[in-house]
Regions:
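Flexible, acidic/Gly-rich N-terminal and inter-domain linker regions that tether
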Residues: 1-81
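Canonical Radical SAM [4Fe-4S] cluster-binding loop centered on the CxxxCxxC motif
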Residues: 76-111
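Conserved phosphate-donor/acceptor-positioning beta-strand/loop module used by diverse small-molecule
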Residues: 91, 186-190
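Canonical radical SAM enzyme core domain
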Residues: 102-116, 135-179, 190-195, 204-210, ...
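Short Fe-S-cluster ligation motifs
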Residues: 117-137
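A structural signal for short coil/turn segments at secondary-structure junctions
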Residues: 121-125, 153, 179-180, 222, ...
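Conserved C-terminal portion of the radical SAM core fold
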Residues: 128, 183-186, 209-270
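A short acidic, helix-capping loop that chelates divalent metal ions and anchors anionic groups
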Residues: 194-201, 264-270
Length: 271
């Protein structure tokens, strides 16, 4: 895989052209890392990628991944406030309504790619997110990621979507504190005040206790925490009691959000 900036500029100095994917329709200057076009006729050049109309949002400075088999994907959009990086599809939950069903495959290449991507993202980016799967399955590498995010994007608001269980290990929470990102929020789902129901929804025994302990440890380590309650048929009956539980026992969290469902993945069976 290669990561490239999108550009419309045909006059970029040749010495750095290999870092760019040129959006081109007619003239094809040499030396660019890839050539993107909505015109299928431009096939007489190496590293050519024909774009469907759905990609007409691509702008100068967007970042894409390309490979030698003709595949490409958009990783970062300069004008978007919803840039979220999927770090892994692996997870230690199997939530009944998961919109991103977990896999067991080794996708650690995504982590390596993300570490490189951080060096390309503009430091003027206002907000960005990390999600999964479960990002903290990377362990100490996840801490490295937060440190590097601070180094390259110190003014960017970072939202991390996690089940929070890894933070039940206080030493891991302390490592996150030492990474010292100035504006990082951990969004952690709590599906029920009832441990049995929460564990059933996430299909993991003992998850409730680890999640609560993780929330407490993060706050002990001066981290921002948002509790998320996804509303569906397995959580709606407990909603008032769950909110009361949070108000009584977790009043120190920074934010509580009631979330709607994404109608993908396992969701259709558990509306």
């Amino acid at each position: 895989h290669r990561l490239l900036y999108i550009t419309n500029n045909i006059n970029i100095p040749e010495v750095i052209r290999s870092k760019y994917a040129l959006l081109v329709e007619t003239e094809i200057p040499e030396g660019y890392g890839a050539y993107f076009s909505f015109n299928e006729k431009n096939l007489n050049v190496n590293n050519f990628y024909h774009l469907k109309s759905a990609f007409n949002y691509l702008l100068e400075g967007d970042i894409v991944r390309v490979d030698d088999r003709g595949n490409f994907a958009t990783l970062f959009r300069v004008n978007s406030t919803n840039n979220t990086i999927l770090l892994t599809t692996r997870c230690n939950h199997y939530c009944l309504m998961c919109s991103q069903p977990p896999t067991t495959e080794d996708d650690s290449w995504i982590f390596s790619e993300t570490m490189n991507l951080l060096e390309m993202i503009p430091d003027t980016t206002k907000v960005m997110g990390y999600s999964g799967g479960e990002p903290t399955l990377y362990g100490d590498d996840f801490v490295r990621l937060i440190k590097k995010t601070k180094d390259y994007l110190p003014n960017t608001v970072i939202d991390v979507l996690t089940n929070g269980r890894a933070f039940s290990d206080y030493s891991f929470s302390k490592k996150i504190e030492k990474a010292n990102h100035p504006n990082c929020t951990f969004g952690i789902p709590l599906y029920s005040y009832d441990p049995v129901n929460h564990d059933y929804i996430v299909q993991a025994r003992g998850a409730f206790d680890e999640t609560i302990k993780g929330i407490v440890n993060l706050k002990k380590c001066n981290q921002r925490v948002e509790i998320r309650i996804v509303i569906h048929k397995q959580t709606i009956n407990d909603l008032i009691e769950t909110c009361s539980y949070i108000a009584r026992n977790l009043l120190f969290v920074d934010h509580v959000a009631l979330m709607g469902l994404e109608i993908t993945g396992f969701t259709r069976a558990n509306l």
